[in-house]
């Protein structure tokens, strides 16, 4: 009898433990994984918007610190008495453990990861409109191609991940050469994105026009392709065919944009390209990362805002924000020339 009771108690304990295991394995109800997402047209657009959201830091870490501060456009004051990332980068003293390098790397690979998920999921999602499906897919291709282009431009050889992978899989991915990534990933992705609609024909998941929402369109794809070809035409690639390809793309951009309407006959008109209109978008913008009013904002503003938005005298050396980053004097001289 005692043995039978022990068997019953043991069986009850096993059932209880199994039940607890099942309970602990219950998926969280407040989060949707990629396997449960990308089921509908609306969810697919949310995923695409999530990729654009990954770009929040691009203007700051990518284009300001990692690009302009290292260029001939800006002069960065050496600061031997204090650590300032912009100073270390701008004077080419930065070491490989600098946080800005890591932040930039992670930002672009987050774009790539999310784009890979979208590209793998959208084809099997339920869509009411095939044209909208193709638009969303081509936006993902544009963003992935752009991300790899910037990684190559900054870091050279990098790992090329073209599908969703587990962490263990990614560890086994070796670096690809920069020219291989440009020719076999960046250009093919951007060529696919050339099938995007023109700005006026871009739609959201509900079919509404989104021509002023800052999303990549056909013109953005052509202009980005031109950037890639111009990069290939120069050092260290020296591709002899790339210059003519860039010229063709830029001619297409000018032809499609009715270039005659974009001429600025006066300084006031020229300044409009830097000043937001009521709708934020302006005719001089091909593609720009936009920040929602009332959102978290553009972090670069606090690092690059001139003391005077419209300087009265271009011959002065204007300090950007509180950082020791200045407009390069020879560039300012060009604005003083008649």
Language-model features and meaning:
Residues 21-83, 190-194, 215-338:
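An aromatic- and glycine-enriched ligand-binding surface/loop that stacks and positions planar moieties
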Residues 119, 151, 159-161, 285-289:
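Structural recognition of the beta-strand scaffold that forms the well-ordered cores
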Residues 3, 164, 291-293:
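Short, flexible loop/turn elements at secondary-structure junctions
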Residues 17-19:
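C-terminal motif of bacterial Sec signal peptides marking the signal peptidase cleavage site
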Residues 129-136, 143, 210, 217, ...:
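Structural signature of alpha-solenoid helical repeat junctions
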Residues 157-179, 184, 236-244:
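Short coil/linker segments at helix-helix boundaries
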Residues 1-8:
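Bacterial N-terminal signal peptides that target proteins for export
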Residues 40, 45-59, 81-155, 171-184, ...:
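Conserved, well-structured interaction surfaces
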């Amino acid at each position: 009898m005692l043995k039978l009771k022990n068997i019953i108690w043991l069986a009850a304990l096993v059932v209880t433990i199994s039940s607890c295991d099942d309970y602990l394995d219950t998926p969280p109800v407040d989060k949707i994984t990629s396997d449960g997402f990308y089921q509908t047209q609306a969810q697919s657009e949310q995923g695409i918007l999530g990729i654009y959201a990954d770009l929040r830091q691009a203007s700051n870490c990518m284009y300001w610190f990692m690009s302009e501060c290292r260029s001939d456009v800006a002069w960065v004051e050496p600061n031997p008495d204090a650590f300032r990332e912009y100073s270390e980068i701008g004077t080419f003293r930065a070491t490989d453990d600098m946080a800005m390098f890591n932040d930039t790397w992670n930002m672009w690979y987050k774009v790539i990861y999310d784009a890979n998920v979208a590209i793998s999921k959208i084809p099997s999602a339920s869509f009411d409109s095939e044209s909208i499906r193709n638009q969303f897919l081509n936006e993902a291709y544009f963003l992935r191609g752009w991300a790899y282009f910037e990684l190559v431009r900054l870091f050279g050889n990098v790992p090329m991940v073209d599908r969703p992978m587990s962490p263990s899989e990614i560890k086994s991915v070796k670096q690809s050469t920069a020219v291989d990534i440009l020719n076999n990933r960046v250009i093919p992705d951007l060529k696919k994105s050339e099938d995007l609609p023109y700005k006026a024909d871009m739609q959201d998941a509900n079919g509404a026009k989104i021509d002023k929402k800052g999303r990549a369109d056909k013109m953005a794809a052509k202009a980005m392709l031109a950037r890639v070809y111009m990069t290939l035409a120069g050092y260290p690639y020296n591709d002899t065919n790339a210059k003519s390809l860039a010229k063709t793309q830029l001619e297409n951009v000018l032809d499609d944009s009715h270039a005659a309407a974009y001429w600025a006959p006066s300084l006031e008109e020229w300044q409009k390209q830097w000043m937001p209109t009521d709708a934020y978008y302006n005719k001089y913008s091909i593609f720009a990362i936009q920040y929602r009013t009332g959102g978290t904002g553009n972090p670069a503003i606090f690092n690059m805002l001139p003391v005077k938005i419209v300087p009265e005298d271009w011959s002065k050396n204007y300090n950007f924000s509180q950082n020791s980053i200045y407009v390069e004097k020879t560039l300012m001289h060009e604005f003083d020339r008649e």
